[in-house]
């Protein structure tokens, strides 16, 4: 394989000649430091290479070493709880090797530790017919995750050898498959190219909600397992805190958090918090189900693209094991900016706002890899990849290309409103602009498993919030006194919905995570208030009298979200009794 020679360097873009027979997206090592790069364009024997490390100091005429392989990552036991850079290099291993807090250029460390021994329990026997995706054994990687060892997708045949139960490293052959006369060894670890989606049997309709513990996300704009969501918002509106809440409390088996081009201190917050936090679904430390990819804004721009693909490939790998995985990417705008930067350096024709014309297709490829699937291989199993990505539009302009193109491909839109954030309403998700295409699909799950009136209660809340917005303009002009009594009740109910349900404190021990049952109990209180109060208003009782009769009950309902724990829901029975008692007294008065 012939090596190339550098002819031009322009930031992260390097042009090399003598690259005959090179392949698109082939990984190369650039210059004397052997910096990792990827071929993104070929013209004759010239290759345009995007380099994933700082190119300072390399010179024309230095060699470019070809590898003949695409950008691939290692998949196997040892991924959970790790912190990787954008190229899947473990940061702790780099620190041990270099004795420095900085990532040295050209450093090569294995993604999966070669020395650790894992206890392998075989699940197949010699002579079995196997195919790609079959589970041949398990490794208990953490108390939360049983790592299922899969046959690589391209391998099929007869199992010639399988090791006995015992401790093995990721490089030890644990099985040998006779594939058309060739002996193919299988190890605990496999490699997969990041730009190629992993295969599956069929894509299924997502019908089960991915519970997040955040009330506005679970109830007003729910996301299903295998769904796609975007969180656009201007600086300071709470994107990162909302995504961190998703990563912490979601009911996913595996969470992969990709910090793509965001500030380093945000990743530092994650790394400090996660070891001490407990998973509310299992009670175990969160790090036992989490993988972090740290590719911060001060790291090379080109590596942002790699980090997104690395994250989604790891998510697909755990999906293939039959798990529900969540990929949180913060933020895809930084990836798009990297594409714009490289497109400009390659002198490509720019499209809207300087972004390359292929931006929509890249975003589509990324979101297309989400979904709930029936996996390949035996035994039959189902897994999902849910994708939630932040988008950072400059100045909060949702018409800019990244946000508008993202909207074409996602089914859930959680727009953050800076005016809500300034009013200290968090999460600052605008209930008028947002949408979810999964409401009809997940309503049956909520009605069956949580509360048979869930859909009815949710729709009442949404209708009330929309009507309140219509009334707000009238109130601004002539004041609330001029409204009809039923409209005054709409304003009061909307205030209760916002204060008791939509607002949520991500830093409060009790309020940070709301179980589905707790959410339904709060909704039920609001629904009861609205239903009974509407009847009384129709009978001529003023809204003000109804609210005054409540005394401290409405503030008590508002405080309940941070006062009543998820395992103390019987306390809501008392609030419900008090509420009904007040309305019974008012009805007696109205009847006389």
Swiss-Prot record:
Species per Swiss-Prot/TrEMBL record: Saccharolobus islandicus (strain M.14.25 / Kamchatka #1)
CDD domains the record matches: ATP-synt_V_A-type_alpha_C, ATP-synt_V_A-type_alpha_N, V_A-ATPase_A
Membrane topology category: Peripheral membrane protein
Subunit structure and binding partners: Has multiple subunits with at least A(3), B(3), C, D, E, F, H, I and proteolipid K(x).
PANTHER family per record: H(+)-TRANSPORTING TWO-SECTOR ATPASE (PTHR43607:SF1), V-TYPE PROTON ATPASE CATALYTIC SUBUNIT A (PTHR43607)
Residues involved in ATP binding: 233-240
Name by which UniProt lists this protein: A-type ATP synthase subunit A
Job description of the protein: Component of the A-type ATP synthase that produces ATP from ADP in the presence of a proton gradient across the membrane. The A chain is the catalytic subunit.
Transmembrane region(s): none
SMART domains: AAA
Any one annotated GO CC term: plasma membrane
EC number of the protein: 7.1.2.2
């Amino acid at each position: 394989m012939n090596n190339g020679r550098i002819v031009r360097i322009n930031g992260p873009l390097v042009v090399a000649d003598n690259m005959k027979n090179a392949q698109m997206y082939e990984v190369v090592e650039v210059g004397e430091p052997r910096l990792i790069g990827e071929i993104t364009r070929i013209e004759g024997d010239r290759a345009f290479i995007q380099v994933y490390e700082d190119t300072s100091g390399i010179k024309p005429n230095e060699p470019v070493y070809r590898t003949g392989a695409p950008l691939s990552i290692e998949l196997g036991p040892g991924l959970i709880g790790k912190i990787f850079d954008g190229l899947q290099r473990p940061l702790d291993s780099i620190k041990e090797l270099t004795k420095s807090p900085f990532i040295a250029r050209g450093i090569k460390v294995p993604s999966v530790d070669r020395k650790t021994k894992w206890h392998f329990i075989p699940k197949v026997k010699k002579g079995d017919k196997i195919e790609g995706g079959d589970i041949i054994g398990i490794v208990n990687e953490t108390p939360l995750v049983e790592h299922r060892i899969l046959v690589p997708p391209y391998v099929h045949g007869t199992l010639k050898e399988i090791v006995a139960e015992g401790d093995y490293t990721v490089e030890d052959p644990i099985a040998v498959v006779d594939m058309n006369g060739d002996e193919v060894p299988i190890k605990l670890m496999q490699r997969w190219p990041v730009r190629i989606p992993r295969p599956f049997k069929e894509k299924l309709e997502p019908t089960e909600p991915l519970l997040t513990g955040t009330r506005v996300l679970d109830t007003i704009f729910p996301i299903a397992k295998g769904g796609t969501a975007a969180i656009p918002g201007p600086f300071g509106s709470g994107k990162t805190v909302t995504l961190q809440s998703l990563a912490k409390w979601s009911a996913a088996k595996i969470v992969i958090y990709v910090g793509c081009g965001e500030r380093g201190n945000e990743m530092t917050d994650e790394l400090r918090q996660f070891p001490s936090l407990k998973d509310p679904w299992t009670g175990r430390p969160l790090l036992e189900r989490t993988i972090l990819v740290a590719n911060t804004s001060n790291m090379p721009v080109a590596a942002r693209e790699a980090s997104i693909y690395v994250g989604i490939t790891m998510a697909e790998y755990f999906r293939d094991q039959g798990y529900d995985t969540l990929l949180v990417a913060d933020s895809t705008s930084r990836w798009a900016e990297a594409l714009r930067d490289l497109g400009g350096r390659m002198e490509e024709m720019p499209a809207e706002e300087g972004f390359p014309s292929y931006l929509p297709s890249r975003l589509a490829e990324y979101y297309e890899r989400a979904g709930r699937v029936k996996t390949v291989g035996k035994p039959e199993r189902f897994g999902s990849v849910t994708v939630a990505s932040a988008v950072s539009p400059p100045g909060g302009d949702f018409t800019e290309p990244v946000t508008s193109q993202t909207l074409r491909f996602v089914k859930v839109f959680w727009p953050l409103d800076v005016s809500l954030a300034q009013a200290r309403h968090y999460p600052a998700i605008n209930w008028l602009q947002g949408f979810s295409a999964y409401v009809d699909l997940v309503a049956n799950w909520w009605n069956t498993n949580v509360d048979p009136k869930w859909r009815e209660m949710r729709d009442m809340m949404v209708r009330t919030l929309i009507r309140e917005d219509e009334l707000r303009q009238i109130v601004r002009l002539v004041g609330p006194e001029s409204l009809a009594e039923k409209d005054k009740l709409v304003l009061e109910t909307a205030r209760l919905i916002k204060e008791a349900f939509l607002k949520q404190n991500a830093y409060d021990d009790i309020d940070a995570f709301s179980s589905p049952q707790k959410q339904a109990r709060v909704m039920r209180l609001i629904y009861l208030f609205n239903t009974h109060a509407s009847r009384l208003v129709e009978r001529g009782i003023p809204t003000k009298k109804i609210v005054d009769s409540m005394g401290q009950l409405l503030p008590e309902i508002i405080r309940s979200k941070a006062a009543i724990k998820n395992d103390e829901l019987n306390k809501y029975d008392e609030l419900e009794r008090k509420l009904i008692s007040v309305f019974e007294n008012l009805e007696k008065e109205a009847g006389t």
